[in-house]
């Protein structure tokens, strides 16, 4: 939009950087198996996580990936993210990315669309293969941009 509005490369770059500074990405992981296969989690931690049916939620802010929460079901993970979004009164945009299941992405989008201003709807797209390989089947990404 900025380029179409006649902004030069430097101005567009500044707008992109400023938007990135307001962005947060959550990753809801349905199975820890692919974190182990990708070397992101030890085999021991993966075994324990699988046995206990742990569903980790990670968050990426300013290029740093950290654990946000651990739940015992994917439904609880979705509730945790909805609760976080409800506490953010300055939401501007929400994007939902899925690895293999667009139905879950669409259902979650419907359940949180009331949180965006002016009747906006969340963007929905399939996650790229690089991130999808680490998140595994059933993974869901939720990206937010705040004002």
What are these regions (language model features)?
Residues 1-147:
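Mixed-charge interfacial surface used for oligomerization/domain docking
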């Amino acid at each position: 939009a900025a380029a179409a509005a006649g902004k030069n490369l430097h101005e567009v770059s500044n707008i992109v950087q400023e938007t990135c500074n307001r962005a947060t990405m959550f990753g809801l992981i349905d199975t820890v198996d692919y974190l182990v296969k990708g070397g992101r989690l030890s085999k021991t931690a993966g075994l324990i996580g699988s046995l206990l049916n742990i569903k980790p939620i990670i968050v990426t802010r300013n290029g740093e990936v950290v654990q946000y929460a651990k739940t015992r079901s994917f439904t609880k993970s979705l509730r945790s993210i909805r609760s976080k979004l409800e506490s953010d009164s300055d939401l501007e945009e929400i994007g939902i990315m899925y690895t293999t299941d667009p139905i879950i992405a669409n259902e979650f989008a419907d359940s949180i669309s009331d949180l965006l201003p002016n009747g906006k709807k969340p963007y929905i797209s399939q996650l790229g293969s690089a991130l999808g390989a680490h998140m595994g089947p059933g993974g869901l990404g939720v990206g937010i941009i705040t004002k």
